[in-house]
Amino acid sequence: MIELIPAIDIIDGKCVRLSQGDYNTQKVYNENPVEVAKEFEAHGIHRLHIVDLDGAVSRHVVNYRVLDQIASRTSLVIDFGGGIKTDEDLVIAFDNGAQMVTLGSVAVKNPGLFKKWLEQYGNEKIILGADVKENKISVNGWKEESQQQLIPFLKDYTKEGVFKVLCTDISRDGMLQGPSVELYQQILKEFPNMHLIASGGVSCIQDIIDLEIAKVPAVVFGKALYEGKITLKDLNRFM
């Protein structure tokens, strides 16, 4: 059964969504992310993906208080990403209730530090974030495209012991146009043992079914929930 991971993206302490990572497209869905998280939990959700969008741009963790509030008021297993660039940022994330962290930019910009953290905290807690646009990895809140190609990037890090990968197709993110099933199939063909978390484009229940059929282990989704394209009741079939 595919693992369901709703996303809460945070700007100014509020639950928002963007389209293709463009901060000019932000739409506020709830002023109180804790309420959103509690509602997820009440419907049987166990996992949560929190993105500190302020942190991603500021290049240091900003919305750790929201993380702390959600972690202390729910039993959700949280992975947290956005702005984790230093040891201090990482400690802040874990101290405020994240059980896992998603690291993208640091894996590109500072591989030595990423590998140190992987060794220190283990591959259950460290998720490699691979945010892809036209087969290249993007960093710093998707504002900068690196020259790293997706498959070689994943090869390098699986050799280092990475097991969990959150792969977002930026062109699909927040667009409600369906996920890149072929992309995820390609990744799983290359790395059959990877715990791949698909992200970007989920628009309806059928999209989640398609990912499950493709044997994708987990999926992150947000906008479809917030826009009412998927209801929390719809998700019962996957519980």
Curated annotation (Swiss-Prot):
SUPFAM superfamilies with a match to the protein in the record: Ribulose-phoshate binding barrel
GO cellular component: cytoplasm
Coiled-coil intervals: none
Main subcellular location of this protein, as a coarse class: cytoplasm
One of the protein's GO biological processes: L-histidine biosynthetic process
Catalytic residues (positions): 9, 131
Catalysis: reaction(s): 1-(5-phospho-beta-D-ribosyl)-5-[(5-phospho-beta-D-ribosylamino)methylideneamino]imidazole-4-carboxamide = 5-[(5-phospho-1-deoxy-D-ribulos-1-ylimino)methylamino]-1-(5-phospho-beta-D-ribosyl)imidazole-4-carboxamide
Highest taxon in the source lineage: Bacteria
PANTHER family, per the entry: 1-(5-PHOSPHORIBOSYL)-5-[(5-PHOSPHORIBOSYLAMINO)METHYLIDENEAMINO] IMIDAZOLE-4-CARBOXAMIDE ISOMERASE
Name of the protein described by the UniProt record: 1-(5-phosphoribosyl)-5-[(5-phosphoribosylamino)methylideneamino] imidazole-4-carboxamide isomerase
Originating organism: Phocaeicola vulgatus (strain ATCC 8482 / DSM 1447 / JCM 5826 / CCUG 4940 / NBRC 14291 / NCTC 11154) (Bacteroides vulgatus)
Gene: hisA
